[in-house]
């Protein structure tokens, strides 16, 4: 009779018993193997993290670049700083004024027209009262200038908003018996609000001193605020030779007019506050002349 014996597994050696083990997915593995696996996992995750950071940096640069292109060539926001364009645009010193979007594309293919509401850089003679918005601290000022370059801080310039009344070659003037005229024809200005100005147009059609006639030089614009009594516009900045006679702006027209090259863009829409959302209309006051 043949005698059979079951195979008996050999007992673990002392070295196996002393070697630390770690359970991974329900399997006991030597600690050395687990450490190697962990190091391999870390080695894979670090390149992924670096890749994600690199992608984020690229996207951030692209976003800033697109924003810069938009501000430079397409459109830019602008804060209305004063009440000179009320009721069309609201603003005042120390309050939350309208924020508008300025279209910078239109005037690359056309010229400003009568009735357009434009944002422009004030000519040198208009900047005597301008106060820089930059810090006196040289370091902070450098940071502001850098942020301004990419559009996160407004440029340090005297940007103004007014309505175009007359363009190059046209003659503008105002008399108490005719009111405001261009080329001798009265204007229709529905954007003027006597209540806003607290004035009676029938009693004071010029809403200030009589002026002109002024023939606007080619390549320049005559601009005025919708809130005439509270607007330092072309009338205010035009040198006068007849002040003693109650007239203004009969001297050098270059002093009161604005170069077309100074125009930043056309006011298109009020984007803030929400209660004021809406378009900024161009009303040609010369229409029908």
Swiss-Prot record:
Keyword Transmembrane: yes
A Gene Ontology biological process term: signal peptide processing
Reactions catalysed, as given in the entry: Cleavage of hydrophobic, N-terminal signal or leader sequences from secreted and periplasmic proteins
GO function term, MF aspect, one: serine-type endopeptidase activity
Cytoplasmic side stretches: 1-53
EC number from the UniProt entry: 3.4.21.89
Ranges of the Extracellular topological domain: 75-289
Membrane topology type: Single-pass type II membrane protein
Bilayer-crossing regions: 54-74
Entry keyword set: Cell membrane, Hydrolase, Membrane, Protease, Transmembrane, Transmembrane helix
Catalytic residues identified in the record: 84, 162
Enzyme class: hydrolase
Localization of this protein: Cell membrane
UniProt cross-references to Pfam families, sorted A to Z: Peptidase_S26
InterPro entries noted in UniProt: LexA/Signal_pep-like_sf, Pept_S26A_signal_pept_1, Pept_S26A_signal_pept_1_CS, Pept_S26A_signal_pept_1_Ser-AS, Peptidase_S26
GO cellular component, one term: plasma membrane
Family, as annotated: Belongs to the peptidase S26 family.
Entry-linked NCBIfam families: sigpep_I_bact
Protein name as it appears in the record: Probable signal peptidase I
Lineage: Bacteria, Bacillati, Actinomycetota, Actinomycetes, Mycobacteriales
């Amino acid at each position: 009779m043949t005698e059979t014996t079951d195979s008996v597994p050999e007992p673990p050696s002392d070295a196996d018993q002393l070697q630390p083990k770690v359970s991974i997915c329900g399997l006991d593995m030597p600690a050395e193997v687990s450490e190697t696996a962990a190091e391999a996992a870390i080695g894979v995750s670090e390149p992924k993290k670096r890749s994600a950071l690199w992608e984020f940096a690229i996207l951030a640069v692209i976003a800033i670049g697109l924003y810069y292109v938009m501000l430079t060539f397409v459109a830019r926001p602008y804060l209305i700083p004063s009440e000179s364009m009320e009721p069309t645009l609201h603003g005042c010193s120390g309050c939350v004024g309208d924020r508008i979007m300025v279209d910078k594309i239109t005037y690359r293919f056309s010229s400003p027209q009568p009735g357009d509401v434009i944002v422009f850089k004030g000519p040198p003679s208009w900047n005597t009262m301008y106060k820089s918005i930059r810090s006196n601290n040289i370091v902070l000022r450098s940071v502001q200038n850098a942020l301004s370059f990419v559009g996160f801080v407004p440029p340090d310039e005297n940007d103004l908003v007014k309505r175009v009344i007359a363009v190059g070659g046209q003659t503008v003037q105002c008399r108490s018996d005719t009111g405001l005229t261009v080329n001798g024809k009265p204007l229709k200005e529905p954007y003027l609000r006597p209540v806003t100005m607290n004035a009676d147009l029938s009693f004071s059609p010029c809403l200030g001193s009589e002026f002109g006639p002024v023939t606007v030089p080619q390549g320049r614009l005559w601009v005025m605020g919708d809130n005439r009594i509270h607007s330092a516009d072309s009338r205010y900045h035009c040198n006068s030779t007849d002040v003693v006679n109650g007239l203004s702006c009969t001297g050098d027209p270059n002093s009161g007019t604005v170069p077309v090259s100074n125009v930043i863009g056309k006011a298109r829409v009020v984007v803030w506050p929400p209660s004021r959302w809406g378009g900024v209309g161009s009303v040609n006051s010369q229409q029908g002349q």
